[in-house]
């Protein structure tokens, strides 16, 4: 198992220390004195962002999936054609310099829609000040991916009167990540740590199966493994994969299945998980199951992300790979011209 010395030696910028503080960061963001902004008669919300910022849009898309508000996520340059005066476009770029999101911001400003931006500075701040766009400037904490809860709970606070998300549900999610920390943080580097146990199990390429409601957790886990552990990872919708992807298991491979499950998944989804487990057992394919905590959808997803992000950090340390540098991303950015 990983030791404290290993974390400090490999994780040179101390990413894990930020994750140890996630509950306090979330609480501080939601309790901030930031003024709420209300947008009336909104029936369509567009979340635009890339990478760690884009994961925030995935989260809100899942949370609002059963509301009367249609949610679009944009991970690229183009807004949906359905944007109108009843649309709220939320652009998030932790760095404030994301080329794609700056383009969306500029295009949204030209339309008859509502608009707000969240960032830590950069060109997005300059644009919003110059063009009188509502915005919130937030702290960058280590990296965009580590800043996830700071931005998520700041958005929940700022748009509390616009987003149909109960305050009690938000507070529940913070309580639960506080409880989760007791099991997965660096203060519990033992076999009882589920994040560390999963990290120790991974040796090949993880294939993450998810039910539709937990899609944002799966997307985030894939990205965290890619950025932190510098390894490939695959995600598949459980139900869809049973109509195609499952056939690939007929050949030997280094792929390792991980099943993400909710405590109260739809009955047909539960049945399908049991069927695919039966298939894996019959064919001697080792797999892992990861269950969400109980609670509202925000609570479930945030806690899964917390556990799985930590898994990616532990896996990177076990692989002797510093989780912080993302040199390949910097290469791409250096050749991308912002508008």
Residue ranges and their predicted role:
Residues 1-12:
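Polybasic, low-complexity association/targeting segments
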Residues 10, 17, 21, 55, ...:
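Conserved active-site and cofactor/substrate-binding residues in soluble primary-metabolism enzymes
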Residues 11-18, 25-33, 37, 43-44, ...:
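Active-site phosphate/pyrophosphate-binding segments
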Residues 23-27, 61, 152-159, 219-226, ...:
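Predominant activation on well-ordered alpha-helical scaffold segments within soluble catalytic domains
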Residues 40-182, 262-267, 271-288:
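Glycine-rich phosphate-binding loops that contact phosphosugars or nucleotide phosphates
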Residues 71-76, 231-242, 286-295:
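A generic structural motif
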Residues 247-327:
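C-terminal active-site/capping subdomain that shapes the small-molecule cofactor and substrate pocket
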Residues 324-339:
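Short, small/acidic-rich helices and loops at N termini and domain boundaries
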């Amino acid at each position: 198992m990983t030791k404290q010395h290993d974390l400090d030696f490999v994780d040179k910028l101390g990413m894990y220390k930020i994750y140890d503080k996630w509950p306090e960061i979330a609480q501080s963001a939601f309790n901030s004195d930031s003024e709420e902004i209300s947008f009336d008669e909104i029936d369509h919300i567009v979340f635009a962002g890339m990478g760690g910022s884009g994961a925030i849009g995935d989260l809100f898309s899942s949370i609002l999936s059963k509301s009367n508000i249609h949610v679009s996520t944009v991970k690229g340059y183009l807004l949906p054609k359905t944007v109108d005066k009843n649309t709220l476009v939320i652009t998030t770029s932790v760095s404030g310099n994301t080329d794609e999101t700056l383009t969306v911001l500029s295009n949204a400003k030209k339309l008859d829609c509502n608009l707000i931006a969240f960032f830590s500075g950069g060109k997005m701040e300059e644009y919003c000040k110059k063009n009188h766009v509502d915005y919130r400037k937030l702290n960058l904490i280590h990296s965009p991916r580590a800043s996830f809860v700071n931005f998520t709970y700041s958005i929940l606070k700022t748009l509390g009167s616009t987003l149909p998300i109960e305050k009690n549900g938000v507070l529940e999610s913070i309580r639960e990540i506080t409880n989760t920390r007791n099991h997965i943080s660096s203060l519990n580097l033992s076999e009882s740590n589920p994040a560390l146990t999963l990290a120790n199990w991974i040796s090949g390429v993880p294939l993450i199966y998810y039910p539709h409601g937990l899609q944002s957790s799966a997307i985030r886990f894939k990205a965290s493994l890619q950025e932190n552990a510098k390894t490939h990872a695959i995600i598949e919708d459980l139900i869809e994969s049973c109509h195609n992807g499952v056939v690939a298991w007929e050949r030997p491979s280094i792929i390792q299945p991980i099943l993400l499950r909710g405590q109260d998944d739809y009955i047909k989804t539960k049945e399908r998980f049991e069927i695919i487990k039966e298939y894996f057992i019959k064919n001697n394919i080792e797999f892992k199951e990861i269950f969400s905590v109980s609670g509202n959808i925000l609570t479930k997803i945030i806690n899964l992300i917390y556990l799985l992000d930590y898994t990616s950090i532990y896996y990177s340390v076990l692989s002797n790979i510093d989780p912080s540098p993302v040199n390949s991303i910097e290469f791409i950015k250096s050749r991308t011209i912002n508008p």
